[in-house]
Curated annotation (Swiss-Prot):
Its cofactor is heme. Was identified as a high-confidence drug target. This is Group 1 truncated hemoglobin GlbN. Transmembrane segments: none annotated. CDD domains: TrHb. Belongs to the truncated hemoglobin family. Group I subfamily. GO terms for cellular component: cytoplasm; cytosol. It comes from Mycobacterium tuberculosis (strain ATCC 25618 / H37Rv). Gene3D superfamilies: Globins. Pfam families: Bac_globin. Binds oxygen cooperatively with very high affinity (P(50) = 0.013 mmHg at 20 degrees Celsius) because of a fast combination (25 microM(-1)sec(-1)) and a slow dissociation (0.2 sec(-1)) rate. One of its GO terms (biological process) is detoxification of nitrogen compound. The gene is glbN. One of its GO terms (molecular function) is heme binding. InterPro entries: Globin-like_sf, Globin/Proto, Globin_bac-like_CS, Hemoglobin_trunc, Hemoglobin_trunc_I.
Amino acid sequence: MGLLSRLRKREPISIYDKIGGHEAIEVVVEDFYVRVLADDQLSAFFSGTNMSRLKGKQVEFFAAALGGPEPYTGAPMKQVHQGRGITMHHFSLVAGHLADALTAAGVPSETITEILGVIAPLAVDVTSGESTTAPV
């Protein structure tokens, strides 16, 4: 196979690589949780949570979801979130904090839109509509 043929068949760059890989995701996840935990409508969901472990799993999840080399090894989203009273309103708030953290990290708006498009289908597994406010 000639050089031109190989160049034409290059794999498209993953979102994971576009945003800077594992290190960039770690920075975004750290900022993301600062924002989420500062949100009075969301912070109570994380009461008693081992945040260090959660951040590690979140980095792993985002890396896998965005085309990184390693698979996500955590529990299924539905299992982790069921019965917690997370509504679409909460999901939208979380998505907004993610977009803000990505923007702060210098991720271009079109890439942020791609990322939110990857995350949006998870709403079905994460939300239950059982409550309109976080537990107190």
